[in-house]
Amino acid sequence: GVWHGKAPISDYDSEKSRFFSEYGFQSFPEFESVKRYAPYPEDWDIRSEVMMSHQRGGDHANWLIETYLLNEYKKPRDFRAFLYMNHVLQGDAIKTAIESHRRQMPYNMGTLFWQHNDCWPVASWASRDYYGRWKAQHYYVRKAYDDILISSVVEGDDLKVYAVSDRLENTSGRLQLQVCQFDGTVVPH
């Protein structure tokens, strides 16, 4: 799998099952929460003794977070940016999984990520930290479980777009796709 098996996040798009549960992706708490247990700047490093003591996923887990992050994004400029990008990474990983599971409807009819909250201030799979602060994952999950989902996935050279509805009645709509550059400029077709 993606976390324990160290597979790429994109592997979520190829997993098949009738029901998914207890899958997840770790992140640290947000910076304001971290400062409550690591108040000194010398501890603001994922390898510091304090940060390692607030990691219950094993000695390799902080390294794994960093490895995934650097595979997906540029190296963050500082510790605070690292925490922020780690939240984006966690959110994107879970969004990828949930959307993939929902696209498999009606073969797959359930998906429960791990986990909602923490019982201690720690790096974990939770979408809300010990202090109740929402991580990016919490926002991503809320959107990924919308009753109407528009989801895209790259398969080879193709971009496939899916519409998934959990509504009991038929729904119609109009979908407009645009390709944009990173600066937001729309690419003409």
Describe each model-derived feature in a short phrase.
Residues V2-T171, T185-V187:
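Substrate-binding clefts and catalytic carboxylate motifs of secreted carbohydrate-active enzymes
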Residues G173-H189:
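Intrinsically disordered, low-complexity Pro/Gly/Ser/Thr-rich segments with frequent PxxP/GP/PP motifs
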